[in-house]
């Protein structure tokens, strides 16, 4: 259980580091005149994300888990998700935040990843992260209850993001 708790703390520290990047980018975007969209949804996503993390580790500690093959698969998925998070941050540079901000002269990223994967931050980072965390902590109840709730909030987020950016895409 000690390994799971220490690894969880490390993953949490990485997420806090990514949040600090987001806050720094957000301040710069606001200074450049960016407008935030979906503020209430961003708050709900943040609450759901934090709740998911804590529910998973509480569930793990109640079970007094050992690091087994399920946890190993979960950790591998988490490592993939974290790698994707930082790749997305690298690709989006200063426009990456955990919120939706659109600049007056917003440019669409057309790199390889964004060309072939729609919403890579959600589908290659967030969803795998939550699945990986559930497996790592063997938190089946957190997954069964938390994932559907999170996915509903995320679906709204994707629609809001697409709506906010619709003027940036040519009409066909």
Curated annotation (Swiss-Prot):
Keywords: Cell membrane, Membrane, Transmembrane, Transmembrane helix. It comes from the Bacteria. The keyword Cell membrane applies. The keyword Cell membrane applies. The chain crosses the membrane at residues 1-21, 41-61, 72-92, 136-156. GO terms for molecular function: protein C-terminal S-isoprenylcysteine carboxyl O-methyltransferase activity. It is a multi-pass membrane protein. InterPro entries: ICMT_MeTrfase (IPR007269), Metal_cation-efflux_comp (IPR052527). It is found in: Cell membrane. GO terms for cellular component: plasma membrane. Its main location: membrane. Gene3D superfamilies: 1.20.120.1630. This is Uncharacterized protein HI_0318. It comes from Haemophilus influenzae (strain ATCC 51907 / DSM 11121 / KW20 / Rd).
